[in-house]
A protein has these predicted regions:
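A conserved mid-protein helix/loop that constitutes part of the nucleotide-sugar donor-binding site
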Residues: 15-20, 190, 194-213, 308, ...
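Short, structured helix-loop element that forms part of the nucleotide-activated donor/catalytic region
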Residues: 42-48, 213, 217-218, 223-250
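Donor nucleotide-sugar binding/catalytic pocket of nucleotide-sugar-dependent glycosyltransferases
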Residues: 53, 134, 138-179
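Aromatic "clamp/platform" in nucleotide-sugar-dependent glycosyltransferases that forms part
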Residues: 252, 271
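Conserved acidic donor-binding segment of nucleotide-sugar-dependent glycosyltransferases
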Residues: 303-304, 308-315, 324-330
Length: 363
């Protein structure tokens, strides 16, 4: 059996969205090593049988000295552990881990989980990011993409490995995110819920605008909530929104399923995604999703059938969509939820994603 090294920028993404792959590798008899900078889910991964390697990493920083240090660490780690194959996730492991693998002649498979805001830059910054990705992925055995737009962009920019494969994100665990019958609240209140980082690029400004306008139109017949970590820039805005009673703020939750179950619709006005896990989980649970018509969101929705799409960065479009949903019948909402579950079962089952990775690992 093989020794497999996983390079990731945090334990949460690995444990919450990719643990089924980790468990499959362990069950198949492989030795699995995990390089992560945090300890949040390190103990769980260790108990499953992984060897944890603490790795210093400034996930979002642009300090060149820190990044060079990370690259050197990866090269040293590869020499010491001599893995048979390496799996890398997110930009820094993809770039610096990938380049280290190429220099050490170790086969590696990279996953582009999304492009974030870096590819919206222009000029020298954009050129630098593209060059870094070219260095990181040049020798890659296979590059996995989570949406077609990311794959197309990389092809246009001539960023490529030896092979590539398109998958539907990390997929969704259909057993964990089980189908729940539509709530049909007797109080006739329509409950909207946003789950995710409370930050500008997730469309939180548009969401706050729509929430306030919905309150003005419908009063107590609409409830708008958020769950997630807040960037410091939004603390005052959230406090004011709560004070004016047009938003409910729920602290970060490890298990969001109970909240999805009680929601009438999940809303994600994001500017860009790799493939939204929140939308997949909501659809799997049988809840309509209202999402930006952007890559990483639109793939999870059949517009008008399992949810509604709207123009990103357009606060009026978001408000109009949420307002339209308030006016829909319970039967229409229930049908949307069932259609969403069927879509997840057909195209987004995480078991299928795991098989796609296993196929490339043993190839």
């Amino acid at each position: 059996m093989s020794k497999i090294l996983i390079l990731a920028n945090n334990s949460s993404g690995l444990y919450i969205f990719r643990n089924e792959l980790v468990l499959r590798l362990l069950q198949d008899g492989h030795e699995v090593l995990v390089s992560i900078p945090d300890t949040e889910h390190a103990e769980e991964l260790k108990k499953e049988g992984c060897k944890i390697i603490h790795t210093e990493m400034d996930r979002r920083g642009t300090n060149a000295a820190h990044d060079i240090k990370l690259y050197k660490f990866y090269r040293r780690l590869l020499r010491e552990e001599q893995p048979d194959i390496v799996l890398t996730y997110t930009i820094k492991p993809n770039v610096y881990g990938g380049y280290a693998c190429r220099k050490e002649k170790v086969p590696y498979i990279s996953t582009v989980t999304g492009l974030g805001s870096s590819f919206e830059w222009t000029g020298l910054k954009k050129k630098m990011i593209v060059t870094m990705y070219k260095f990181g992925l040049k020798g890659c055995k296979c590059v996995f993409f989570q949406n077609a737009e990311n794959k197309r962009l990389f092809e246009e920019l001539h960023i490529k490995g030896k092979d590539s494969k398109l998958v539907n994100g990390s997929g969704v665990n259909l057993e964990k995110h089980r189908f729940e019958e539509y709530p049909g609240h007797k109080d006739d209140i329509t409950r909207f819920l946003y789950i995710g980082r409370i930050m500008h690029e997730k469309g939180i400004d548009e969401y706050l605008y729509a929430a306030k306008k919905l309150r003005e139109k419908y009063g107590d017949k609409v409830s708008v909530s958020v769950i997630g970590y807040s960037d410091e820039d939004y603390e005052d805005k959230l406090n004011q929104a709560q004070k004016e009673k047009y938003l409910k703020v729920i602290p970060f939750q490890k298990d969001v399923h109970p909240y999805i179950r009680e929601a009438d619709a999940i809303v994600l006005p994001s500017y860009h995604e790799g493939m939204s896990n929140v939308l997949m989980e909501a659809a799997a649970t049988g809840r309509p999703v209202l999402a930006s018509n952007v890559s990483g969101c639109k793939e999870t929705v059949d517009d008008g059938e399992s949810g509604l799409l709207f123009e990103a960065k357009n606060k009026e479009a978001l408000y109009d969509t949420m307002s339209f949903f308030v006016e829909t019948s319970i039967d229409m909402r229930r049908a949307m939820g069932r259609n969403g579950r069927a879509k997840m079962e057909k195209d987004f089952d995480r078991k299928k994603i795991v098989e796609a990775y296993i196929e490339k690992i043993i190839e």
